[in-house]
Amino acid sequence: MVLRAVCGLALLGPALAAPAGAAVTPAATTAAAAGTTVAGNVRYELIGRWDVAKLNQILTSDSPKFFGVSVAYTPARNAVKLYRVTYASVIPEQGNRPITATGLLAVPETGATAFPLLSYQHGTVYGKQQVPSFPDQSPETALAIAQFAGQGYLLIGADYFGMGVSSEPEGYMVKASHQQATYDMLMASRAVLAHMKLTAPKLFIGGWSQGGFVTMAFLEKLESAGVPVTAAATASAPVDVMATLSGFLDFPRKNDADWISTLFILSSFSFENYYRVPGLARALLTPEYYDVARKAYERQPFNPADVPTDLHKLLRPEYFDAQFFAGSAYGRLLADTQAYRWVIKSPVRNYFGETDEAITPGIGQLAMTYQRAMGSGNMAVEAVSTGNTSHRGTYATAVPQWKRWFDSK
């Protein structure tokens, strides 16, 4: 039984079942399952094929049911082949320690050889396999595949470090690692596409919630590396994690989600592991709930009912003092976890919901406000309201708007 949700996906409980009509067709041959190696350290394997009927089932039935809103999506026109890509990467926070990561590549079956490419960055999930390269367990990825790959876009998505088939601990909201995972996934995917004799002249990037933050951080890295980005779009993006989390402590709202406690759990243990700050999570969490929080982060067996939804039970009382929070080791790391404080050059649209239970309208508009605050203002970033939408509803409503905007580029 799924007990709560992060980014609308399973948080505490078993992995979600595949959406109806969206199950992955197993790879047909042993050779396909074994995979193909390209560029020395990049491997890809066929994991399934979704036909037009399945893609349209996702758009017309599965997604409205899961996200809780009825949205008019553009019907799928073509089937899609799905591949898991395995690639070499490094952890920047640990002296570029080498690791292996995974992600998804979705290829439209149209007979064409050139396609626009969307890199989709997924939101927060509890299950290690509720990520792009296990698309039958990821309703948000399924929606992106159906709307974009089913309409002739190549689609890629990194699983992030510690997710998918990775043996690493989760690197939740660890900025440089998210940048590395997505950048290396793009490079690996381009190697796979070259092997398939396919090209992608236009690059789009998009993501929801945590994935919205990752999308903006990815954009920062791409612009720094001189990689052209045709356009970037997010939904419910916490572009300033310190402002987002401190808001739950200092200015709680009546509609704040009951799964917010998990954001503190995942980030504190991830920061402790990736930034190598022993005792960071223990300093933040109350002794009564430290052990169950650690088990939740490490995906060990535990009773989900033991994780409190009341932040006053989970967090030590001194963290509700804004000055203490900001000056703590955890707070200082959070203050550096932002993805909007540079002069953005690429066209960006940040979609936000007026009644989102996790991301306030102020956070949703923050990147635009910052860019326009500089002198005469940088107009590259636009914040777009999706109306009175929930966290899930904001993403579901934004996706077809992303599509129309990307198509115009």
What residues fall within each predicted segment?
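Accessory cap/linker subdomain of secreted extracellular hydrolases
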Residues: 56, 238-341
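Active-site machinery of serine-nucleophile hydrolases
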Residues: 138-164, 179-186
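Alpha/beta-hydrolase active-site loop
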Residues: 172-194
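C-terminal catalytic histidine-bearing segment of alpha/beta-hydrolase fold enzymes
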Residues: 323-337, 349, 358, 365-409
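Short beta-strand/loop motif that positions the catalytic acidic residue
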Residues: 344, 349-356
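Short, surface-exposed "cap/lid" segments of acyl-processing enzymes
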Residues: 93-102, 106-151
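Primarily recognizes the serine-hydrolase "nucleophile elbow" in alpha/beta-hydrolase
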Residues: 187-258
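Catalytic-loop region of hydrolases
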Residues: 22-113
